[in-house]
Amino acid sequence: MCFSLPSINKEGYLFIVVSFIVTCIAFSISWGFGVTCLFPTLLCTYFFRDPARIIPGNKDLVLSPADGVISKIEEVSYPLSTNNGEEKKFTLVSIFLSVLNVHVNRIPISGTVKEMHYKKGKFVSAMSDRSSNENEKQVIVIEYTKGKEIIVEQIAGLIARRIVCNLRVSQSVKAGERFGIIRFGSRVNIYVPTDVEIRVSEGQTVVGGETIIANLNKENTQEKLTFDLV
């Protein structure tokens, strides 16, 4: 039997190393103190885990950008600079991430990054729907075909004060690729066109890069899937 350690996201290296050093010092002082310090070290390692995912390869599928639970699905309007600032209709799928979820974010669909905006704001608890409008966030607009966009928002929370996004405007992206992380509990919103088939429901648990959020081609209900391990 082969045993392998879980992959750790690079954003967690500093936290884990510092926690490990503190734990070693604590054990040198007393066994009980060391055990007490060991718990946050293990928790930190668990939080920054970055497991490989089996990515569906069909280009018509929109994948979940994050692990978590679907807290809301509703039709909304969203202003885009690529649309001269005018609002366009989208279906919002909001995903809540607890501190126990994998917090690595993944690209929902292949395309090109057309816009990126970092909006300053509050740090309301990510459990509240208010966080979508009031909290600090990173907005990413991905054009998957000419004139068609999907929007992803990485939203900070009460504990999550650090959003990491490793994308740039005009960058080509592939569905399922890692693109960032939000530290310690958060929310991720994805906005898809209103004319697509939504494949999830409120209260459903989703897995980033694996769970199908929507099908862009309603007529293709029997899509043939291929898979990649990423």
From Swiss-Prot:
Keyword check for Ribosomal protein = no
Any idea which UniProt keywords this protein has?
Cell membrane, Decarboxylase, Lipid biosynthesis, Lipid metabolism, Lyase, Membrane, Phospholipid biosynthesis, Phospholipid metabolism, Pyruvate, Zymogen
Q: What EC class does the entry list?
A: lyase
> Is Lyase given among the entry's keywords?
yes
Q: Which residues carry this modification: Pyruvic acid (Ser)?
A: 186
Pathway listed for it is: Phospholipid metabolism; phosphatidylethanolamine biosynthesis; phosphatidylethanolamine from CDP-diacylglycerol: step 2/2
Q: Record's NCBIfam families?
A: PRK05305.1-2, PRK05305.2-4, PRK05305.2-5
Q: How does it assemble?
A: Heterodimer of a large membrane-associated beta subunit and a small pyruvoyl-containing alpha subunit.
Its protein name is Phosphatidylserine decarboxylase proenzyme
